[in-house]
Every structure is written in structure tokens, then in C-alpha cells.
């Protein structure tokens, strides 16, 4: 299937590793030009070097929790490529704590990184899409639907806010032919997850899916690219869960074992 991405320009925030890197690579392989950003210069340069073999890539150090840096990044991308068609808001952080353990600085960090960055990214993208149309994809989380109580108390509520924000911006931008969609990944084998969540808990969560494993970043990237493409031209204010069936049954492990018994 031709996704209609050849010649288009896609921005992927947090594109130096994990889901962001996989998404940037997927866009490039579909013929798009890609701009990535990260706060960490060394990681960004390494990612840019690895991605160059797939197609045109632009990289810039950006703190997406700051509005002006988003706006400047969008301007630089537009000047570099001459257009801006797609924006993927991918940056996030977890904060592995109970609610009572967060101090004011940590709360602000969570809000700035997980929520404000998405607001600013949508604003920055819209400045360049309102005349020619485009697509925005926000990366939320399964935690938006399932409580993360006792593990990362603020993460789920902030991701829920992204889901609502997606629908709100979809309504505000629709007259300009700008679509806004959202993806809710389940547990994914990213550097962020591995650093924030103990290995034993990661294993338990993987076994709690119908597919009995964590997702690979590439398995999240493909739906993101689809939502941003012309193949999804009638989709907006849409949130897609990609979780290996984690939220579809009360006891995924039990369902898996019973089905396995029947097959045997």
C-alpha cells in the first residue's frame, strides 16, 4: 500500500531513541523527509548519523517543554525543507513514584514534559499547516485508560489529558484540513521503560498482554505513520490503542492459557 508520504516532511519529537527513532526511520523508508529533536546533543547526533542512510534527515537540540523552542524548531524545519506536513508529539517521561512522593519541582517536570510539550507542538505545527493542511499524531499511553496507581501516579492522568487534547485540537483545526489523532502504546521495550520500571515488573506486564510480550518500538511506529499518512485521510479525533490486547480482558494471562489448552 502506498501511504502517500513521498515528498512530505515529518517532525518527530524525541526522535533520538525508542518509539521516536523507530517512527523517524519508518517515515524515511516511506519516502518522507524527517526532522527530529532531542535535548541530548550526543544522542541526537548519533541518531541522525544512523538515519541518514534512509533519507533526508534534519536534527536540532530542542527542549519541547518550552513553547518558544517548539516554535523556533518548526520555523527551522520549514526553512530547511520548504514545507511541514506532519508533526508527531512523542516526548514524555514517567516519574516512577507514588502521588504523595512528588515534590513541586517533579510535578512541574511531569506536566511540562508530558503535557505542555504536546500543546506547544500542536501550536507550532498548526502555524505551518493552517494554509496547506497536515496531520498531527500525539503519543499517549495505555496508562491514559488504566490507572498507574502506586507506580507513576501522575503519568496516566497526564496521558489522559493528551487524549482529550487530541479531540479538542481536532475540532479546532478541522476547518484548515489539519487532522489530529492519537496513539496509545502499551508496554514497549524502549530505553525509557527499561530505565524507569524494574525488570521483574516489565516481565509481569508483558505476561499480562494477550500476546505475552512487550511491543517493539517499530510496532508502535507503524500505526503512527499510518495515522499521519493519506491512507488515514478520513481519520481525525481518533485514538488507537496498540497494547497487545492488554486492556481488552480482565485477565489476559488466563485467556491465553485457556485458548492454548483448547488448541492442544
Where are the regions a protein language model picked out?
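Alpha-helical segment proximal to the catalytic Tyr-Lys
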Residues: 127, 171-175, 233
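Conserved glycine-rich cofactor-binding loop
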Residues: 9, 16-18
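Substrate-binding pocket helix/loop in short-chain dehydrogenase/reductase
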Residues: 98-111, 205
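The beta1-alpha1 cofactor-binding region of Rossmann-like NAD(H)/NADP(H)-dependent oxidoreductases
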Residues: 61-73, 104, 218-219
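Short C-terminal tail/terminal secondary-structure segment
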Residues: 236-264
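Active-site helix of classical SDR
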Residues: 122, 158, 166
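Residue(s) in the substrate-gating loop at a strand-loop-helix junction
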Residues: 141
Amino acid at each position: 500500500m502506498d501511504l502517500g508520504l513521498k515528498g512530505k516532511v515529518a517532525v518527530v519529537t524525541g526522535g533520538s531513541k525508542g518509539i521516536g527513532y523507530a517512527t523517524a526511520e519508518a517515515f524515511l523508508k516511506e519516502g518522507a523527509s524527517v526532522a527530529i529533536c532531542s535535548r541530548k546533543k550526543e544522542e541526537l547526533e548519533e541518531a541522525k548519523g544512523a538515519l541518514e542512510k534512509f533519507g533526508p534527515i534534519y536534527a536540532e537540540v530542542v527542549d519541547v517543554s518550552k513553547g518558544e523552542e517548539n516554535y523556533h524548531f518548526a520555523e527551522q524545519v520549514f526553512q530547511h525543507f520548504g514545507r511541514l506536513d506532519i508533526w508527531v508529539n512523542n516526548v514524555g517521561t514517567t516519574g516512577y513514584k507514588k502521588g504523595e512522593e512528588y515534590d513541586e519541582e517533579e510535578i512541574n517536570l511531569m506536566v511540562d514534559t508530558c503535557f505542555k510539550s504536546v500543546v506547544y507542538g500542536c501550536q507550532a505545527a498548526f502555524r505551518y499547516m493552517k494554509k496547506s493542511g497536515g496531520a498531527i499524531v500525539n503519543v499517549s499511553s495505555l496508562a491514559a485508560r488504566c490507572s498507574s496507581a502506586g507506580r507513576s501516579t501522575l503519568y496516566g492522568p497526564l496521558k489522559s489529558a493528551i487524549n482529550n487534547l487530541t479531540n479538542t485540537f481536532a475540532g479546532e483545526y478541522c476547518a484548515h484540513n489539519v487532522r489530529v489523532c492519537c496513539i496509545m502504546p502499551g508496554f514497549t521495550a524502549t530505553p525509557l521503560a527499561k530505565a524507569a520500571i524494574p525488570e521483574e515488573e516489565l516481565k509481569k506486564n508483558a505476561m499480562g498482554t494477550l500476546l505475552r510480550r512487550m511491543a517493539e518500538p517499530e510496532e508502535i511506529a507503524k500505526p503512527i505513520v499510518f495515522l499521519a499518512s493519506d491512507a488515514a485521510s478520513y481519520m481525525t479525533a481518533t485514538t488507537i490503542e496498540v497494547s497487545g490486547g492488554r486492556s481488552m480482558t480482565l485477565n489476559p494471562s488466563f485467556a491465553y492459557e485457556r485458548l492454548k489448552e483448547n488448541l492442544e
